[in-house]
């Protein structure tokens, strides 16, 4: 007998799904979303001076805890369907997202050097396998992604 995923509706466009075997949570679209669509705005619930696995980096020493909190369940993918615009504080669809599809973003698009590196399990054709932050990736890979203004500034200073 297969145990069903637990789902929690969190907005007009998304729900959190919890895997019954691992307990991991992810955010999924409950409606179709189009490229360029602002799917949510966000704010800083708290500003931390160090990264942790729940923060989004906006400056060298500013890592924000997201508000609304359920945005923390937007997981990583090397083939993301949304970007975090940390300047406008908006999450924007970058390709069509079908109802039921997991909402994902590319963590190095906002993170310079992550608190915890991890092995990526996204299974995309372009999977990078180990995710550590933009500082650990070659420019030719990063140019394939839409990056936050902060990460782009870091790269500009590096070159």
Positions of the model-derived regions?
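Conserved catalytic SET/PR domain of SAM-dependent protein methyltransferases, capturing the structural core
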Residues: 1-159
